[in-house]
Amino acid sequence: MIALLAPGQGSQTEGMLSPWLQLPGAADQIAAWSKAADLDLARLGTTASTEEITDTAVAQPLIVAATLLAHQELARRCVLAGKDVIVAGHSVGEIAAYAIAGVIAADDAVALAATRGAEMAKACATEPTGMSAVLGGDETEVLSRLEQLDLVPANRNAAGQIVAAGRLTALEKLAEDPPAKARVRALGVAGAFHTEFMAPALDGFAAAAANIATADPTATLLSNRDGKPVTSAAAAMDTLVSQLTQPVRWDLCTATLREHTVTAIVEFPPAGTLSGIAKRELRGVPARAVKSPADLDELANL
């Protein structure tokens, strides 16, 4: 079984669409998705600055578009045809994962990511909040310190890698007095994602999600909530919406990949973060970070 992974916000890089736009039909596809997202994704994915694509309202649809453009090309080449796959996406990457697993159409996925990004950006503007990575330290001590500061472990990505989220004043205190043997690194995001600070985004996102045609997953699809498979369209969409204010348990997704004895891991663009975690947590399992069309041909040997 091969794991297909869709990255989340923070993975975006300047020019990440450039190599993909050389493919037949890619420019037309991005033009259609640009219309759906009400953004010029071609420009944003080729010539826009790092600062511009860091904007939550821009980054989320751009990342989903990059992932799905690569997945469409992979499907066109039939590289993994006939092979069993298990699909997971990190945070906004879940939307792309839903499209890969057949729950929603790719066009709807990009439009939904645009709504999600816009609604979350508005929520971020209501109060100064943020996120910081806590690297290392004893997990129990780290979680205890976060609780003391009224911070939330918004992302639990892997052993020794927890992302704290909450008010900026509390994050500053965490950086000044971190848990023993832990380092704290502020993340360049606009707010405390996957916490109750995102509650103002729920109504708008839920309304957009409710208007999308859905189908039951055609592949094993994991939830960020608990790392377990979601088996119906209704459950999948409920989970997707509620995930805005709930922690991302990528560590549990990784545990499920281990239980399913995956034989290879493919991370779609903008790739690097999730395949890096997989190499550390699932030692011995080949992990490929797809960054350009040339990387797709190498997947034939998986």
UniProtKB/Swiss-Prot annotation:
Membrane-spanning ranges: none
One of the protein's GO biological processes: fatty acid biosynthetic process
EC numbers: 2.3.1.39
Record field: catalytic activity: holo-[ACP] + malonyl-CoA = malonyl-[ACP] + CoA
Keyword presence, Endoplasmic reticulum: no
Other remarks in the entry: Was identified as a natural substrate of the M.tuberculosis proteasome. Was identified as a high-confidence drug target.
InterPro entries the UniProt entry points to: Ac_transferase_dom_sf, Acyl_transferase_dom, Acyl_Trfase/lysoPLipase, Mal-CoA-ACP_Trans/PKS_FabD, Malonyl_transacylase_ACP-bd
Pathway: Lipid metabolism; fatty acid biosynthesis
Domain of life: Bacteria
SMART domains documented for this protein: PKS_AT
Isoglutamyl lysine isopeptide (Lys-Gln) (interchain with Q-Cter in protein Pup) crosslink, residue number(s): 173
PANTHER family listed in its UniProt record: MALONYL-COA-ACYL CARRIER PROTEIN TRANSACYLASE, MITOCHONDRIAL
Active site: 91, 194
Class of this enzyme: transferase
Family listed: Belongs to the FabD family.
Protein keywords: Acyltransferase, Fatty acid biosynthesis, Fatty acid metabolism, Isopeptide bond, Lipid biosynthesis, Lipid metabolism, Transferase, Ubl conjugation
Protein name as it appears in the record: Malonyl CoA-acyl carrier protein transacylase
GO cellular component: cytosol; fatty acid synthase complex
Organism: Mycobacterium tuberculosis (strain ATCC 25618 / H37Rv)
Post-translational modification: Pupylated at Lys-173 by the prokaryotic ubiquitin-like protein Pup, which leads to its degradation by the proteasome.
MF term (GO), any: [acyl-carrier-protein] S-malonyltransferase activity
